[in-house]
Structures are given as C-alpha cells and as structure tokens.
Amino acid sequence: LAVVQAISSQTVRTSATLPMYSATFAGRIKALSVAHDILTRTRWKGIGLNELLENVLSPYLVAGGSRISLSGPPVLLPARSVVPLSMAVHELATNASKYGALSDPRGRVSVDWSVDEDADPQVDMNWHEHNGPSIPEGTQAGFGTTLIRRVISQDLEGRVELDFAPAGLRSYLQFPLRTSVQLNDLLGGAQH
C-alpha cells in the first residue's frame, strides 16, 4: 500500500487538474494491478518478457492492426523484475499516447530486445516511436520519465537512455536478468 500512496502523492504533484490526476493515477494503478495479476498467476515465478509486454500494452495491441510490434527471443524475467518493468513500459506507452507516436493515427511503436549472454545475462530493450508528431527541441522530462529512470536504474539495477529525437522517442533499457535489490520504493520515499 505504501507504493500506491507514493504513486498517488507523486501523481497529485504533477497533475494540473483533478481529471488529469484521476486519469493518470488510474493508469498507474492499472499497470501495478496488471503486474500483480501476472505474479499471482505465475505464483511469483516470473514471466516471459513478451507476455509481460502484451499484458501491459494490451490497450494498444489492437487485433488485426497493432500499432505496436514486439520482437525478441524468449526471455524469462524473474518475479522481482515484473513490477518495475511493468511500470516503466506503462509510462512509455502513456507518454506515446499523449505526446508521441500513439497520439497520431499513423504512429507506430516497435519494441525489440535481445539478451547479452555473458557471465551476468542482461536484457537490451529498445522502444522506438515512428510517424508521430515531432518532438519539440528542449522537451523537458516529466514525472513519467523520472519514474522510468528510477525503476530501471534502482529497482532493476539497469540503465536507461532516452533520446527525444524530433523523429520520435528512442528509448534504450538495459537490465540484468537477476537483481539483488528488492523492489525499492517506486517514487522516492515509500517503504513496504
């Protein structure tokens, strides 16, 4: 519940209106709920990356005309990666639907990943937006972007590169398939 409280307080700080708060908060809680549904269904044993993406992105994966393509080898994510990655992907999709490729009927998003199989296997995941509105120069990162950076770097012990290129957002997420850190507070201050 502390995570929900933290999501609420951070969302209220960055929402200009009550309807904006309500929609943003509901979306974040839905992403958290999807992650916990996955974990319950798998008895906290993890899930395939493709399945996680399909679950989180289901509102955008329309039968017969998907605007999001997913491509990569089978990857089993450990249970403790499910919530942070779900939250990060939700924020990418939300930002794409508000400001990026998914805000334009012609826009598309491609998500691809690979696994670097060295002594410490890690996932390299790319989110690339196409045919959306151009991103104005000097675009500032909002709270959603801050959340993406936090959950990937702190909770997954990974790294994030976000390129707000005029042609569309390019995101690179890299994280190990094992994590030694338990789910940290998602938003900077919540304990659970």
Predicted feature residues:
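Short beta-to-alpha transition helix within the HATPase_c
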Residues: S22-I38, T42-V62, D112-S114
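Conserved short strand/loop->alpha-helix "switch" segment adjacent to the catalytic nucleotide/phosphoryl-transfer site
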Residues: V62-R108, T139
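Conserved transmitter core of two-component histidine kinases
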Residues: G65-P73, M125-W127, E161-D163
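Short beta-strand/loop element within the Bergerat-fold HATPase_c
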Residues: R106-D120, E129
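Glycine-rich nucleotide-binding loop
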Residues: P133, A165-Y172
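ATP phosphate-binding glycine-rich loop and adjacent ATP-lid/helix-beta elements
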Residues: P133-E161, Q191
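C-terminal end segment of the histidine kinase catalytic
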Residues: L173-H192
